[in-house]
Swiss-Prot record:
Organism: Herpetosiphon aurantiacus
Localisation: Cytoplasm
EC number, UniProt record: 2.5.1.48
CDD domains: CGS_like
Stored SUPFAM superfamilies: PLP-dependent transferases
Protein known as: Probable cystathionine gamma-synthase
Keywords: Amino-acid biosynthesis, Cytoplasm, Methionine biosynthesis, Pyridoxal phosphate, Transferase
Organism classification: Bacteria, Bacillati, Chloroflexota, Chloroflexia, Herpetosiphonales
Catalytically driven reaction(s): O-succinyl-L-homoserine + L-cysteine = L,L-cystathionine + succinate + H(+)
Cofactor note: Binds 1 pyridoxal phosphate per subunit.
Length: 319
């Protein structure tokens, strides 16, 4: 049976526990597992490799992104770093020019020291992406909408270009959440999330995730998840499972509030510009309507008066 998004968020990977019938996934707070004999385990042997609470979360997140597989990590950057370990010295990556600051730092300050090269371009035009491809390009890294300027990238068009050249694509879907956008259905090879943000939703846990429907990529990433070890503990996984149950409700309310605030700020005399994909004034509003279910809850604004006005606004903000 095909369940709706909200039902999958509550139930996918979360069947009642077989011994007690508990309807909430237990926190399997263990590092090791008893084996039936030498080399004969029941599916779990060491919690860096696998843990039942983590398995439940991975199953749930894969269902939400309509992917075959998901892997979770100790942070979004832990997921990003693990993914980059699939590349080798001399490989080239194309990335958006408004990528999340932590990702930019990882690429420019860390990965370049290990022989990778990067070009940061405007992802709005698929032909610009095509023009940036080199013989050694191995990965196209999309973030849409971007943090913080809410630029969009046409996922389906760019993934078509990537497939023509045998290049992997990954979409950082953190700002949209799987409720509003599912890049794998648009052709992406992989999707990345900081589960710290919308998926966890309660500001009480740090985590990351990668989803894919490509079996080969999954096996590579699963090996690296275990080998590099940037895995979340079972309590962190449980917190994300708890938070994701209300994702659909939170996203609907968040978008409704964001649109009302964006429309209000558009008319405010102290505001020079409001950037929100849900406004017709956003240069990629039509693309947002095409590839997103909703516009999300993130807004960027440019104030008249520059940094001084921005500092004054932040210092006076009450909520």
């Amino acid at each position: 049976m095909d369940y709706g998004f909200a039902t999958r968020a509550i139930h996918a990977g979360q069947d009642p526990e077989s011994v007690t019938g508990a309807v909430i996934v237990p926190i399997y707070q263990t590092s090791t597992y008893a084996q039936r004999g030498v080399g004969d385990h029941t599916g779990y042997e060491y919690s860096r490799t696998d843990n039942p609470t983590r398995t439940a979360l991975q199953t749930c997140l894969a269902a939400l992104e309509e992917a075959k597989h998901a892997l979770v990590f100790a942070s979004g950057l832990g997921a990003s770093t693990t993914l980059m370990l699939m590349l080798k010295a001399g490989d080239h990556v194309i990335c958006g020019d408004d990528v999340y600051g932590g990702t930019y730092r990882l690429f420019q300050r860390v990965m370049t020291e290990h022989g990778l090269s990067f070009d940061f371009i405007d992802m709005a035009d698929p032909e610009a992406v095509r023009a940036a491809i080199k013989p050694n390009t191995r990965l196209i890294w999309l973030e849409t909408p971007t943090n913080p300027l809410l630029k969009l990238a046409p996922i389906a068009a760019i993934t078509r270009v990537a497939r023509e050249h045998g290049i992997w694509t990954i979409v950082d879907n953190t700002f949209a959440s799987p409720y509003n956008q599912r890049p794998i259905t648009l052709g992406a090879d992989m999707v990345l999330h900081s589960t710290t943000k919308y998926i966890g939703g309660h500001s009480d846990v740090v985590g990351g995730a990668i989803m894919t429907s490509n079996d080969e990529l999954y096996e590579k990433l699963k090996f690296l998840q275990n080998a590099a070890g940037a895995v979340p503990g079972p309590f962190d996984c449980w917190l994300v499972l708890r938070g994701v149950k209300t994702l659909s409700i939170r996203m609907r309310d968040d978008e409704r509030n964001a649109l009302a605030i964006a429309q209000f700020l558009t008319e405010h005399p102290g505001v020079e510009k409001v950037i929100y994909p849900g406004l017709p004034s956003h240069p990629q509003h039509n693309l947002a309507r095409e590839q997103m279910r909703g516009f999300g809850g993130m807004i960027s604004i440019l104030l008249k008066g520059g940094a001084e006005a921005a500092n004054a606004m932040v210092s006076k903000t009450k909520l």
